[in-house]
Amino acid sequence: MTRPLIAALILSGTALAQIKVGQIKGPLLDAHNCYPYHGQHTDRLDRALSLGFPVAIEQDVAFWKGQAVVSHTPKTTGVEPTLKAHFFERVRPLMEKALKENKKSQWPLIVVHFDFKDLQQPLLEDVWTLLGEYEPWITTARKTADPAKLSKFDVRPLLVLTEEADEQEAVFYNKVAVGQKLRLFGSAHTKDLTARATNYRRWVNYSWRAVEPEGQPKAGNWSEDDLARLHALVSKAHGLGYWIRFYTTDGFTAAENQGWDAGYNFGSHEAVLARWKAELEAGVDLIATDQYELLAKFMKPGK
């Protein structure tokens, strides 16, 4: 791919992000796995919220005795915090302040992304009910009779995303009556993606292996071919009306590791900064990382 074509894709991708993705003022830092592991790393959510807004936050969700909890595994033990306590009540002061100030041009302040580790219907229904408790905070859209007709968002301080499983669509979309509010929005199936965004499926969620198939630990230097794959994916997603997220790009040493997955690690700041630069220039809407502070610093104007 020639540099002029890459430059054109950068401009067109960014423009599409601004036009079609007006409710996510991206690119955004996406705080990956932003919850405790086995009682450790309990400061992750506070760290993410301290970096300023807007920000995206991932919460992995499982089930324990009838309640949604945040957990990296479906094998819950009862020590996991509830989704309600860990996330919703933690952000309550921020949401109430935002509603009082009513600075709608700055909304959403937080994009929360649920990664369900368990798809049993009672869990999904519990989360739907939980979202109903906090609906005044939540960006919604009316269900249309035709899924291909996207209704406008009623933008609030919080936008809720979930992933691609059809089991989720059955509860979060199919059971909702036409004209009623959708409280969260799923991702599209990315395999052989050709369909445009629907009223429910508004984003796409790619593993970084779609860009560098060898995976982060085995990746070599960032290349023109890698850049071309990245821009092709972003351009296609935006052209079909989707927001786009990539997971997960890290670059840390053993001494820096705070319970992070080695499978996402390029091994150095230099290596991950090259990828972040490319993601920012390509107009990726949600850039997932475990190194919240490092990416936040890199994203500051002038960096």
Segments (PLM) and residue ranges:
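Sec-dependent signal peptide recognition
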Residues: 2-8
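Phosphate-group recognition and catalysis centered on beta-loop-alpha active-site segments
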Residues: 18-303
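Boundary at the C-terminal end of the N-terminal hydrophobic targeting segment
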Residues: 7, 15-19
